[in-house]
C-alpha cells in the first residue's frame, strides 16, 4: 500500500506500521517524504544520473558540503554501500602498492559485520553464514572483535593496509562502537 506523511507504511487491510528499522543498510528518508519527493521532481527534468567519469552541479555541491562537514579532502560517490566497500578495498590496496610497491595487502575487518553481497564485500563481512556459499573469497582478510582494541592490535602486521568497520554494527542488533575503540583503531 502507499505510504503517507513520511511516518510509515500501510498494508492492504489499512493497518499502519511505523518502521523503526529505517530499511536495511540504507539511509532513512522516511516514506513519502515531501521534501525528498520535490527534490526528485525538480531534478528529473535536468540530469538524473551520469557516470562518475563526469561531474555535474548537484554532485559538486554535495561534494563541497561533505568536505566542509567532515574536514576530509576527497569524496568518492558510488551507487550503493557495496560499491563503496569495493572501492575502499581497492583504494587501500592500491595506495599500499603505489606507496612503495609492496605487497601490503591485508585488511582487518570486524566479526559480526555485514558489508554487502559482492565478492569483495562478502570477503570483509565477518559472518560465515553469508560467506560460506561463495568461497573461496579474496585473500588477505583478517577478523577482529568489534569494540575490542586488543583483538584488532593482535591482527596488525607489517602487511596491514587497512581496517574496515561499521561504526554501528546492525547485524543481529544495534551495536555502536565505543568512542575509545574508534580512537584507538584510528591511531
Give short role names for the model-derived ranges.
Residues 2-13:
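Single conserved hydrophobic/aromatic residue that forms the stacking wall/gate
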Residues 15-16, 174:
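Residue-level signal for well-ordered, solvent-exposed loop/turn and beta-edge residues enriched
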Residues 16-102, 106:
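Glycine-rich loop-to-alpha-helix module at the N-terminal edge of alpha/beta enzyme cores
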Residues 17-21, 154, 186:
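Beta-strand scaffold of nucleotide-dependent catalytic cores
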Residues 65-162:
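PLP-dependent aspartate aminotransferase-fold enzymes
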Residues 157, 175-187:
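Catalytic PLP-binding core of fold-type I/II PLP enzymes
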Residues 160-174:
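Short acidic, glycine-rich surface-loop motifs adjacent to enzyme active sites
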